[in-house]
């Protein structure tokens, strides 16, 4: 809630109910945005007849286009009038949408976990003024998305309003200085009047898009400037047809992912993926916890679970010898390389490799490192628990992982961690190294 007891959700519902054709006509006028977005959908969507949720899809401009291409599309929108218009437009196009559902993007409880192969969230994030609501909408989009499925999340850019004013109402900054300052400082265009009216919006800064999606558990593949190079300059281009129009579509699709243009467009499109590894790890953890197998998650997954935005290529689970063979017994159908004692010049462990829906999992029992002529147990000295989809996951402190990467010479990975580390914890572990020469997983260099 903002502006007293005014509910922005009801305001925006009225806004679209009053003119349900508004969004359909907007995309007719702004052909470049539509073309670039369709290009992204064509690149990242799984092939038809994949199940697609168009959440906040308005009168169904994208939903109907995807249905024409063979996708099974559920259209979900806040506005009943938008949904009625979508039915009419679908009939005109002679296509059938799977369902028409009315509701808010922060509550998709009518849909089961993993119900869709892809999710479009191209509208709701324009109007959710509170950060918690934007996070909730992304969390719900992730929940109903199948592991490995893409999300397409659209935002209005922080600078869309002043750019619009420059093109259409140059006196606007002088006439509305307080509104301009609030948008620049907070991104919020709040309800006006006691009952609220007009366009309620949140204008996202380009720099916040990726972290917001990552905190919701997505891995971001791209952020696109939907208008490409023609933001506020598109009238002439949009009047083109044939080869000339196709050439501009190709150019704008090619440059859309260039970070240098993201502050100079009206709409940003984040393309993200619900990583399979999170779902796989949660499933494994529940079974290991139930079986009483002690383990810790290490490597990139441990860092990502602490909130560091890095891609995870595989899962490393560290346990003892008995735990490694117990893991193999529990997941015998997933064995790629059976657990066995393996060693090289530096490391020795009871190592096995497994495959879960394309995610490689390594189980490491009693990891040792050669020190001099002896094998020394390499173990962590810290532990904390993080929650992953309701499953408690044991991981080392992020600070210990950061120091481990320093020791290994992976300064790039260590630097990614340091911004998220607790300074006092980091210093405490470093002082422990100074006193003992050992910090958790093994020695780290003195410098």
Q: What name fits each language-model region?
A:
Residues 2-48, 61, 65, 150-183:
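Conserved class I S-adenosyl-L-methionine
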Residues 61-107:
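Class I SAM-dependent methyltransferase SAM/SAH-binding core
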Residues 283-315, 319-321, 325-328, 397:
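Active-site nucleotide-donor binding segment shared across nucleotidyl transfer reactions
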Residues 371-447:
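Catalytic cores of NTP-dependent nucleotidyl/adenyl transfer enzymes across multiple folds
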